[in-house]
């Protein structure tokens, strides 16, 4: 019984569950998608909130440049490159034996400074927003001051009386632990069994307390939440429900628009933009997709990619039960090499906010992630962690789908030929060489 209903009844009502339960790579193109002008109201946030977040990051830029010299060249703004991957595109055409029209680009959040993943957006933003609230409340800075002052000894001593806590499979904990420690906060990261050892080691090297669990992500989050409850000096970063995290990710879209403009890429109804986003609990891809919909409206098509063993958002939105159901309820084990996506229960906040804004959801098995990892390195010399490749199969999924999605969305052959597909590479820039070699060896063995 699942929520009081026999599994057979679930399968009768939601036939795509059979593929999810059997761990077969599958896709579902959302029949409930609505015009963005209408569906954006579901989110409960708007363009003014994203602009406020962007302005906050600008205020903190001098401090970031001072604390992290690798950001000095960008003036303390944490941003990633956008690169066309035409050789990889050709390799995918051969790999999938399909034409795959359009152009293929990679958004390299894998190589964001400070923590080497998309979590450097939302995670760092939330800690900065919390630090700003404390600093303004206690008179450490004013809104028009130079925030690099917060690196001074008296400010660090003040922050040291406060704690930041978070539950994580790895990358979110890495970004929050590093920025928290850099500001002087005490930081504790509750890490699930899926977290890679090198990420734990890196956090400890920054003076962060790492609490390890033999259980999965949801348990780590709950324990982190429990630690923070009732302690006015502890701020819990709630990956399942945080609006600050969500807004930190959403800022990426306005910057991407500038990068696309600089590259001469048009985005409109005749030149659609498809953005393929790896999804764990949903905050990162949800926030980015929200920002993209604000920036490009119905000309952008956002799709979430998940491991076959951890399809929590697909499951939650498809059934309409969101965080009420977990993959484990259906006998799916939530065990995947894509550690950043090893989440069994989705964010109900993100699922409900974005359920009429996303074009679809698809799953990818671990072996395919490793094949794509090796194929990208072989064709372009770019190295990513397995999680970051989840969206690389998306161009084939959209091109070959049999569900009438393209016709429903008016995606004619001419429009697909003019399309830009963007794979959001979410992490991998800090993977140790020995670990990366093992990833590549596994991928090459599966390809050859």
Curated annotation (Swiss-Prot):
This is Probable D-serine dehydratase. It comes from Pseudomonas aeruginosa (strain ATCC 15692 / DSM 22644 / CIP 104116 / JCM 14847 / LMG 12228 / 1C / PRS 101 / PAO1). SUPFAM superfamilies: Tryptophan synthase beta subunit-like PLP-dependent enzymes. Transmembrane segments: none annotated. Keywords: Lyase, Pyridoxal phosphate. One of its GO terms (biological process) is D-serine catabolic process. Its cofactor is pyridoxal 5'-phosphate. One of its GO terms (molecular function) is pyridoxal phosphate binding. The modification N6-(pyridoxal phosphate)lysine is found at residue 119. It catalyses: D-serine = pyruvate + NH4(+). Belongs to the serine/threonine dehydratase family. DsdA subfamily. InterPro entries: D_Ser_am_lyase (IPR011780), Ser/Thr_Dehydratase (IPR050147), Ser/Thr_deHydtase_PyrdxlP-BS (IPR000634), TrpB-like_PALP (IPR001926), TrpB-like_PALP_sf (IPR036052). It comes from the Bacteria. Its EC number is 4.3.1.18.
């Amino acid at each position: 019984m699942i929520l009081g209903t026999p599994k057979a009844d679930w399968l009768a009502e939601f036939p795509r569950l059979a593929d999810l339960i059997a761990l077969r790579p599958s896709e579902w193109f959302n029949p409930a998608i609505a015009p963005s002008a209408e569906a954006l109201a579901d989110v409960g946030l708007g363009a003014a909130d994203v602009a406020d977040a962007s302005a906050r990051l600008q205020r903190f830029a001098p401090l970031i440049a001072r604390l992290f010299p690798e950001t000095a060249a960008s003036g303390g703004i944490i941003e990633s490159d956008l690169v066309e991957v035409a050789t990889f595109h050709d390799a995918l055409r051969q790999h999938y034996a399909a034409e795959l029209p359009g152009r293929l680009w990679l958004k390299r959040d894998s190589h964001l400074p400070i923590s080497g993943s998309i979590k450097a957006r939302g995670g760092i933003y939330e800690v900065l927003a919390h630090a700003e609230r404390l600093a303004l409340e206690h008179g450490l800075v004013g809104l028009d001051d130079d925030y690099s002052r917060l690196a001074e000894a008296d400010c660090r001593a003040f922050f040291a009386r406060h704690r930041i806590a978070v539950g994580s499979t790895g990358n979110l904990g890495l970004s929050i632990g590093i920025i928290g420690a850099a500001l002087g906060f005490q930081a504790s990261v509750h890490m699930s069994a899926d977290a890679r050892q090198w990420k734990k080691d890196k956090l400890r090297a920054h003076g962060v307390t790492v609490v390890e669990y033999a259980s999965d992500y949801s348990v780590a989050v709950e324990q982190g939440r429990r630690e923070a409850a009732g302690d006015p000096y502890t701020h819990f970063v709630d990956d399942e429900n945080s609006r600050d995290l969500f807004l930190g990710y959403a800022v990426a879209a306005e910057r991407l628009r500038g990068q696309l403009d600089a590259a001469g890429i048009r985005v409109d109804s005749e030149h659609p933009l498809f953005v393929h986003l790896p999804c764990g609990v949903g905050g990162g891809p949800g926030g980015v997709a929200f920002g993209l919909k604000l920036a490009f409206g119905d000309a952008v098509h956002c799709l979430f990619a998940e491991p076959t063993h951890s399809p929590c958002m697909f499951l939650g939105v498809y059934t309409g039960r969101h965080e009420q159901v977990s993959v484990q309820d259906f006998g799916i084990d939530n065990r995947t090499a894509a550690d950043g996506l090893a989440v069994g229960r989705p964010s109900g906040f993100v699922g409900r906010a974005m359920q009429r804004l996303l074009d679809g959801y698809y799953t990818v098995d671990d072996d395919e992630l490793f094949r794509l990892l090796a194929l990208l390195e072989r064709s372009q010399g770019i190295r990513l962690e397995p999680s970051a490749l989840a969206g690389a199969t998306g161009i084939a999924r959209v091109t070959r789908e049999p569900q009438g999605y393209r016709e429903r969305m008016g995606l004619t052959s001419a429009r697909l030929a003019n399309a830009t597909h963007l794979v959001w590479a979410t992490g991998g820039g800090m993977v140790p060489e020995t670990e990366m070699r093992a990833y590549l060896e596994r991928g090459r063995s599966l390809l050859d």
